[in-house]
Design a protein with these regions (language model features):
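Structural signature of PLP-dependent enzymes
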Residues: 1-9, 28, 41-43, 109
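Short alpha-helical basic/polar micro-motif
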Residues: 2, 48, 93
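PLP-dependent enzyme catalytic core of the Aspartate aminotransferase-like
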Residues: 6-10, 69-134
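Hard-cation-handling environments
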Residues: 12-18, 22
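Conserved PLP-binding catalytic core of the aspartate aminotransferase-like
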Residues: 21-75, 79-86
């Protein structure tokens, strides 16, 4: 449980370093919500694009959001799934950098392909089960 929170704190810190606002200013638990309003704010599209590269998040409303409830400006994500695989703070920060790269380059297919390739490398290095294929 300590590693789950350590990974979440590393992720929140890395989002802020990358210029993405964490809604609560950080996290004290396994979850965080980031504000993507500076990057177009369409969390439905962002969720779909992240799904395509193997990173799973959820849309989330944020305080004072000007966007409609089905297309809010927030993305909610957490650290339990990556921590269960054995990822630590270093890899958690890398996952954030991949997310931010996709957010900032949403229309660039080449970058999205690079991100998908890197995600596959990470999950292969940190499998759920020894013989699990992704």
């Amino acid at each position: 449980q300590k590693q789950i929170i350590s990974n979440a704190k590393a992720m929140a810190d890395e989002f802020q370093r990358q210029g993405v606002r964490v809604v609560s200013g950080g996290t004290d638990n396994h979850l965080m919500v980031i504000d993507i309003s500076l990057f177009g704010g369409d969390s439905k599209k962002m969720q779909d694009e992240l799904d395509k590269v193997g990173i799973y998040v959820n849309r989330s409303a944020i305080p004072f959001d000007k966007r409609p409830p089905y297309y809010p400006s927030g993305i909610r994500l957490g650290s339990p799934a990556i921590t269960i695989r054995g990822l630590k703070e270093k890899e958690s920060r890398e996952i954030v950098r991949l997310i931010v790269s996709l957010i900032k380059n949403i229309k660039n297919k080449g970058i999205k392909n690079q991100i998908k390739k890197r995600v596959k490398e990470i999950v292969k290095k940190f499998p759920i089960y020894e013989d699990f294929q992704w």
